[in-house]
């Protein structure tokens, strides 16, 4: 199936990917994460996020968060209100993370003409 090479559409957009290994209960982690997500959702430049849990491992999660640009993401992390959220997540989990930019996209339905591509 064809993919679309990044053609400058949303070229500034960045995706933060964070993989968590949870040491406490999944329900507690998800509750703390929901509060963290609500904090980020109020920040300028936040686009969306998805928290995924691995099917066969209750303690393995991945968060995928999209931001309009790197500066917006950086400003959100610098907000004084972020530290309590980071501390709460670190108390329940360890994580690995990275900031990514799109290189190829396959829009829903496999449309490579550009309609439906975001």
From Swiss-Prot:
InterPro entries given in the database record: ABM_dom, Dimeric_a/b-barrel
Ranges for domain ABM: 14-100
Keywords for this protein: Antibiotic biosynthesis, Oxidoreductase
Recorded consequence of changing residue 18 to A: Loss of monooxygenase activity
Catalytic activity: deoxynogalonate + O2 = nogalonate + H2O + H(+)
Listed result of changing residue 67 to F: Loss of monooxygenase activity
Phenotype for residue 63 to A: Loss of monooxygenase activity
Outcome reported for the amino acid change (mutating residue 29 to M): Oxygenase activity comparable to the wild-type
EC number: 1.13.12.22
Pathway noted in the entry: Antibiotic biosynthesis
A molecular-function term among this protein's GO annotations: oxidoreductase activity, acting on single donors with incorporation of molecular oxygen, incorporation of one atom of oxygen (internal monooxygenases or internal mixed function oxidases)
Result after altering residue 89 to M: Oxygenase activity comparable to the wild-type
Uppermost EC category: oxidoreductase
Effect of mutating residue 90 to Q: Moderate decrease of catalytic efficiency
Quaternary structure and partners: Homodimer.
Job description of the protein: Involved in the biosynthesis of the anthracycline (aromatic polyketide) antibiotic nogalamycin. Catalyzes the oxygenation of 12-deoxy-nogalonic acid at position 12 to yield nogalonic acid.
Name of protein: Deoxynogalonate monooxygenase
Species this chain originates from: Streptomyces nogalater
Encoding gene (name): snoaB
